[in-house]
Amino acid sequence: MKLLLNTVYKFSAAHRAMLEAVCPGLELVELNNSAVEQLDGTEVDFLVSEQVPRNLEAWGRLHWVQLLSAGSNQLAGHPIQKTTIPVTTASGTHGVPIAQYVSCATLMLAHRMPQVLQYKETQQWPNRLALAGRPLRGQTVGIIGYGSIGRECARQLAAFGLRVLCLKRDPQARQDEGFNAWPGTGDPEGRIPAGWFGPAQLTEFLPQCDYVVVTVPSTPQTEGMLGLAQLALLKRSAHLIVISRGGIVPEPVLAAALRSGLLAGAVIDCYVQEPLNGPHEFFSTPNLIMTPHMSGVFEGFWNLMVDLLAENLRRFLTGAPLLNRVSHRLGY
């Protein structure tokens, strides 16, 4: 059987030994993130890649695709959705580092870092009372999306004394059935949130929040879910952190809300168009911290990814359910 790795990452000798122990005789082929439509997939059984070929008729032996991302919005409208070929994501590998990023972002907003850091630029001692930080203890954070990332955000932010609310597609499903590469983390039993909300309850959920963390995948249901009408429900002192995908908060709406003071501040790590280079209105928007989709980029990712790959390979060969299998119906 042949496994094709089409990414910037490479298998170490230890990685190869791990995979070959699961599947003796497995042929491992490495490419450097090549254009997948130009590849010869006629003899490929397993594909590890961020790109998924559309010309599936030329990949007649393809049995399974493993993505390197936690999300799968790149499959929207893709021909593979009309097949029985399973696609799995890297969900569960990013929880701790992305939650660290969210904790860092929350602290930066609470301590007014976009304004405080101007001190070095102006070289003038500021009015410190005007830049006073806000203690997190007793504040409320609303987490939209309560998968592996949202649950670890809840665990870390609760340690600061924040009251946690969560909003998810099915608030009755409180246990986490997904993969978690970080034992002892997250909220597997769903015990942290003080309140659970469904999508139809945004009008009850948002007014309670001092911070809103967006972790939901990009789907037709989540696209534009936080528009002007929804942001207007927040306190004017509220802050927004978006780490999943662009477009869930329409970019012109977010920029206008920050410029008008409807929203106190935001941290954005994902955009409709990536890579995002200027000109773009975000680059001149006040009280906005921008990062280039870095929250899930961390040292050690590839080792965790290969562990997941080996486990899913074992499951595939034994007929067990694959971890993180994408639902083509739900889009994630």
Which residue ranges define each predicted feature?
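Phosphate-coordination loops involved in phosphoryl transfer and adenosine-cofactor binding
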Residues: 84, 137-140, 237
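Rossmann-like adenosine-cofactor binding region
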Residues: 171-281
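Rossmann-like dinucleotide-binding domain for NAD(H)/NADP(H)
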Residues: 237-332
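Glycine-rich NAD(P)-binding loop of Rossmann-like domains
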Residues: 117-152, 198
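N-terminal glycine-/charge-rich "phosphate-binding" loop or analogous flexible N-terminal tail
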Residues: 1-44, 165, 169, 175, ...
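Oxidoreductase and adenylate-handling cofactor-binding alpha/beta cores
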Residues: 99-118, 157-162, 307-320
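Glycine-rich, N-terminal phosphate-binding loop of Rossmann-like dinucleotide-binding domains
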Residues: 51, 69, 214-216, 244, ...
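Phosphate/diphosphate ligand-binding glycine-rich loop within oxidoreductases
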Residues: 42-121, 130-134
